[in-house]
């Protein structure tokens, strides 16, 4: 196998490859761009016009997605998977990956869409570099642009595999992309309705890609992801890469639960208190009238929405950041 196929090994060791560019036996060009970043380019005659960005390790302890990208890259480097798409593989936070931690100083996935410009430290610099790499990759005109940012969660979930679909004013969510997610094993999709500062929101809003944050299960250390089933996603990614996807009309939204954001719970001060058990699962339902959280100046979050559920509750975030999202069921009306 070509040395550049071992991007994960190089990244965890903090090493640069001796050769920055290599060719597979069937003419696929692999080019190391910077730490944790590798571009894969098919022969021109085989290129189907898709630019696919696959990112993982934005949080360093979310290892199942990292291992998935590692397997795909190994298959390409060995010649077992023959891409027809251009692909950019990104490991988001190499230093946190080496430490086995979510982040070192600050959460990289809260530093996109310009947020890094008002911050400092190496993770702010990394967010800036990731934006630059993505912008360069998606700079070629007249090509399809698709970005999957792969994650696992710090807590359990009543719906284990789900996606978050970013929002941009004047742009509709795509039924075709939702059906593709369903075929990849996603059980639910959260249709967002306001700007965001995560990586997928940057590539969706600023670069025009169809972009998604994919949550694949619970975060576990390297080598301990037997309980995270990514078979359907891995199969669909291989089909996207080698151009063997079934016709779009064969995919459907059957069984896919749709949700929209009702409110975000923002932590304003150190007095913030979230009235939820520490081990509550994502997508847990909350009754109307339930006191969800309190903060300074008698700020109270009381459940008003029928069918409300909570995802990503985290009272330990920094002040000014989101400490949870209240979501409600949505319909497929308005999809493009």
Swiss-Prot record:
Name by which UniProt lists this protein: Succinylglutamate desuccinylase
Statement: the UniProt record of this protein carries the keyword Zinc-finger: no
Catalytic activity: N-succinyl-L-glutamate + H2O = L-glutamate + succinate
Enzyme class: hydrolase
Active site residues of this protein: 215
Binding residue positions for Zn(2+): 59, 62, 151
Pathway: Amino-acid degradation; L-arginine degradation via AST pathway; L-glutamate and succinate from L-arginine: step 5/5
Family: Belongs to the AspA/AstE family. Succinylglutamate desuccinylase subfamily.
Primary role: Transforms N(2)-succinylglutamate into succinate and glutamate.
Annotated GO MF terms: hydrolase activity, acting on ester bonds; succinylglutamate desuccinylase activity; zinc ion binding
Cofactor: how and how many bound: Binds 1 zinc ion per subunit.
EC number(s) on file: 3.5.1.96
An example Gene Ontology biological process: arginine catabolic process to succinate
Keyword annotations of the record: Arginine metabolism, Hydrolase, Metal-binding, Zinc
Cofactor: Zn(2+)
A Pfam family this chain is assigned to: AstE_AspA_hybrid
NCBIfam families: arg_catab_astE (TIGR03242), PRK05324.1 (NF003706)
């Amino acid at each position: 196998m070509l040395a550049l196929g071992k991007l994960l090994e190089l990244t965890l060791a903090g090493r640069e490859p001796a050769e920055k560019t290599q060719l597979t036996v069937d003419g696929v060009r692999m080019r190391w761009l910077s730490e944790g970043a590798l571009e894969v380019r098919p022969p021109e005659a085989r290129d189907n016009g898709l630019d696919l960005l696959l990112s993982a390790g934005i949080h360093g302890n979310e290892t199942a997605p990292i291992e998935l990208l590692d397997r795909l890259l190994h298959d390409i480097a060995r010649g077992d998977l023959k891409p027809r798409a251009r692909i950019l593989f990104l490991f988001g936070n190499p230093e946190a990956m080496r430490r086995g931690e979510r982040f070192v100083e600050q959460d990289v996935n809260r530093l996109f869409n310009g947020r890094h410009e008002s911050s400092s430290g190496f993770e702010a610099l990394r967010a800036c570099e990731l934006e630059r790499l993505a912008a360069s990759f998606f700079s070629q005109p007249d090509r399809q642009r698709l970005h999957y940012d792969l994650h696992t969660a710090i807590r359990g979930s009543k719906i284990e595999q789900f996606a978050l679909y970013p929002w941009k004013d004047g742009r509709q969510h795509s039924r075709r992309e939702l059906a593709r997610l369903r075929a990849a094993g996603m059980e639910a999709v959260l249709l967002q309705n306001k700007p965001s500062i995560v990586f997928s929101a940057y590539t969706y809003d600023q670069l025009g890609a169809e972009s998604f944050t994919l949550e694949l299960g619970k975060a576990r250390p390297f080598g301990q992801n037997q309980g995270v089933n990514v078979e359907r996603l891995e199969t669909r990614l291989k089909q996207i890469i080698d151009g063997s996807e079934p016709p779009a009309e064969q995919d459907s939204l059957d069984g896919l639960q749709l949700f929209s954001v009702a409110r975000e719970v923002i932590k304003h001060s150190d007095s913030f208190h979230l009235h939820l058990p520490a081990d509550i699962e994502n997508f847990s339902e909350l009754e109307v009238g339930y006191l969800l959280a309190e903060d300074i100046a008698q700020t109270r979050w009381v459940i008003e929405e029928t069918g409300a559920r909570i995802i990503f509750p985290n009272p330990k975030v920094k002040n000014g950041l989101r400490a949870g999202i209240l979501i409600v069921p949505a319909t497929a009306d308005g999809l493009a």
